[in-house]
Swiss-Prot record:
This is 11-beta-hydroxysteroid dehydrogenase B. GO terms for molecular function: 11-beta-hydroxysteroid dehydrogenase (NADP+) activity; 17-beta-hydroxysteroid dehydrogenase (NADP+) activity; estradiol 17-beta-dehydrogenase [NAD(P)+] activity. Expressed in seeds (at protein level). Not expressed in stem, leaf or root (at protein level). Substrate binds at residue 185. The chain crosses the membrane at residues 10-30. The proline-knob motif may be involved in the targeting to oil bodies. It is an enzyme of class 1 (oxidoreductase). InterPro entries: NAD(P)-bd_dom_sf (IPR036291), Sc_DH/Rdtase_CS (IPR020904), SDR_fam (IPR002347). Residues 321-362 are annotated as: Disordered. It comes from Sesamum indicum. Has dehydrogenase activity against corticosterone (11 beta-hydroxysteroid) and estradiol (17 beta-hydroxysteroid), with similar activities to both sterols in the presence of NADP(+), but negligible activity to either sterol in the presence of NAD(+). May be involved in signal transduction regulated by various sterols.
Length: 362
């Protein structure tokens, strides 16, 4: 057996690469034809369908809501910051959404997920797309974290905050032959410093949905969206740091990476979901790093060591401070995140994000 495995280890990788090189043009042609057909002839009509979006109070979730609104979908917007949802719901109505429900809820609690799913069914009678966008990152070296109580919070938000809504909504998605859209990240396989726990949670998330894809077969579609470095709250300060506080991001990473527009990523996600794409990748050129990780891991290791180290002492450079991420009396009780403690605020003035103003003028 050892001899056979040794032989296969030597023969299979180069033979597979050679076969892939010969079949790639044909596969690319087939994929392109499918994309054209699904884009122009078979794209799902979202008019009057029901789309539930978690983490809809900012960033990717907000922009996805606007994209579905332009397609005439009925929306259910879920987040902890209800005051933000009010303005976003008005923006969505102006962009074409016939009806918009907003609900304050914590997606890491199964009972609250059950509540907003049931309220959606009671009001609309169905749910067609479930869009999970909740996410929370961090910017610390794992060994330098001063409080390990933040570790479960990262897993709660990035993993269970997606799993619980999916678990509750799945029977209704089967009835409507609906779709689940997942906000993941290339960091599930691309090693970046200061993001170890976030990357681990995203890896668990993608493996969960890849397995679920086979379990639900063709009854429920699943679109996994992976993004590189884009301009969201996570790149503008919405991070968990060593001291357990929300702080403005300035220079946590050792290398500057240009962020792509979140509006474009949201547009690609919705278009891909309506086409029935299993994956949406933005930007797609990140895929090349995956090939290097599988077939030439040393090259990837050398590249990142060169790009992501500064040769000096580790540093964390912040400007400003925010509300406490963890309360002293209960270290896991709250986090400044998409899903912070349910604090009802009085109605404020209607807010319109700059991105909405730009979309409205187009």
């Amino acid at each position: 057996m050892d001899l056979i495995n040794s032989l296969l280890n030597f023969v299979v990788p180069p033979a597979s690469l050679l076969m892939l090189a010969f079949t790639w043009p044909t596969l690319f042609f087939i994929t392109t034809c499918e994309w054209l057909y699904n884009t122009y002839l078979n794209s799902e009509n979202m008019e009057n369908k029901v789309v539930l979006i978690t983490g809809a109070s900012s960033g990717i979730g907000e922009q996805i809501a606007y994209q579905y609104a332009k397609r005439g979908a009925n929306l259910v917007l879920v987040a902890r910051r209800e005051h933000r949802l009010r303005g976003i719901s008005e923006n969505a109505r102006r962009l074409g959404a016939p009806n918009v429900l907003i609900m304050a809820a914590d997606v890491v609690k199964e009972e609250e997920c059950r509540r907003f799913i049931n309220e959606t069914i009671n009001y609309y009678g169905r749910v067609d797309h479930l869009v999970n966008t909740v996410s929370l990152g961090h910017t610390f070296y794992f060994e330098e974290a001063s409080d390990s109580s933040v570790f479960p919070i990262l897993m709660d938000i990035n993993f269970w905050g997606n799993v619980y809504p999916t678990y509750v909504a799945l029977p209704y998605l089967r009835e409507s032959n609906g779709r689940i859209i997942v906000n993941a990240s290339v960091e599930n396989w691309l090693p970046l410093p200061r993001m170890s726990l976030y990357s681990a949670a995203k890896s668990a998330l993608i493996n969960f949905y890849e397995t679920l894809r086979f379990e639900v077969k063709n009854e429920v579609g699943i679109t996994v969206a992976t993004h590189g470095w884009i301009g969201t709250e996570m790149t503008r300060g919405k991070f968990m740091v060593e001291e357990g506080a929300e702080m403005q991001w300035k220079e946590e990473r050792e290398v500057h990476v240009t962020g792509g527009p979140v509006e474009e990523f949201a547009k690609q996600i919705v278009s891909g979901a309506c086409r029935g794409d299993p994956y949406v990748k933005y930007p797609s050129w990140y895929d090349i790093f995956f090939l290097y990780r599988v077939f030439a891991p040393k090259v990837l290791d050398w590249t990142f060591r060169f790009l992501l180290t500064n040769g000096g002492a580790r540093r964390t450079s912040f400007i400003g401070t925010g509300r406490p991420l963890l309360e002293t009396s209960s270290p896991r009780r709250s986090a400044v995140m998409e899903g912070s403690s349910p604090r009802r605020l009085p109605p404020g003035p209607l807010t319109f994000s700059p991105a909405f103003q730009q979309q409205k003028s187009e």
